[in-house]
Amino acid sequence: MSIPKGPSLAVLPMADNGASTAGPQILQPSGWPAPKGYANGVAADGRIVVTGGVIGWNTLGHLPADFVAQVRQALSNIAAILAEGGARPEHLVRLTWYVVDIEEYLANLKILGQAYREIFGTHYPAMALVQVVRLVEKAARVEIEATAVVPR
């Protein structure tokens, strides 16, 4: 039996903030360039916390018109949902972003990165960005789904 040869895989531990050492691990195939602002893959073992699609409205149901403000609030909302489930930002294993205008996202990438780090720190899970025609909430410019795994 022949085993196909492919790239070897590096499994790197994530930053330890005093949490369990059994937390998520970054999956980075050997020889691949290091990603910036996301992970190529994440492996984790524990209790799964999943959000629905989260938009940038506040507790009063107000949705700002500004794209960056919507992203900042959506990320804050995700942090609140994670906390409700006993998860912290370092437990994130996946974020899927849905935007109505990818050019708007790219034009604001630097400030979006700053907002992300203010809320989640420098932990970057696996991420995907998808442009859509529109979101259910017509005024929403971004919707984000999150998955976290809390170590046992």
Kindly give the residue locations of the regions a language model identified.
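N-terminal presequence-like segments and the immediate start of the first folded domain
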Residues: 2-93, 99-152
